[in-house]
Amino acid sequence: MISTVALFWALCVVCIVNMARYFSSLRALLVVLRNCDPLLYQYVDGGGFFTSHGQPNKQVRLVWYIYAQRYRDHHDDEFIRRCERVRRQFILTSALCGLVVVSLIALMIWH
């Protein structure tokens, strides 16, 4: 029988790997954004996005831009594809993180 603790840690590893994939896709999206739409890149603080002095309110703008699917009217097809990918990965990573939290609570109650 599979240990529940081992299953929990496997779920944590899968969540961490998907987070890394999400951040990598977000970086690639910002590179494409810098080339195809410099004004939007500046609007979401693309240059300082992954730095300690980045502006969280501008970072949230990009998240809401993608969440609301406002990119669908953009002129660059590659940018639209990257936004779709980042959106799907964000939904997957959010669901996995939620599952990890629920699993942790269940593990604490069960053991």
UniProtKB/Swiss-Prot annotation:
Major subcellular location class: membrane
Transmembrane residue ranges: 1-21, 90-110
Gene: uspB
Subcellular location: Cell inner membrane
UniProt keywords, alphabetically: Cell inner membrane, Cell membrane, Membrane, Transmembrane, Transmembrane helix
GO biological process, one term: DNA damage response
Gene Ontology CC terms, in alphabetical order: plasma membrane
Name of the protein described by the UniProt record: Universal stress protein B
Other observations noted: Overexpression of uspB causes cell death in stationary phase.
InterPro entries: Universal_stress_protein_B
Periplasmic topological domain: 111
Record-stated family: Belongs to the universal stress protein B family.
UniProt keyword Cell inner membrane, yes or no: yes
Organism: Escherichia coli (strain K12)
Induction per the UniProt record: By growth arrest in general, by carbon, phosphate, and nitrogen starvation as well as osmotic shock and oxidative stress.
Disruption phenotype: Cells are sensitive to exposure to ethanol but not heat in stationary phase.
Bilayer topology: Multi-pass membrane protein
Cytoplasmic side: 22-89
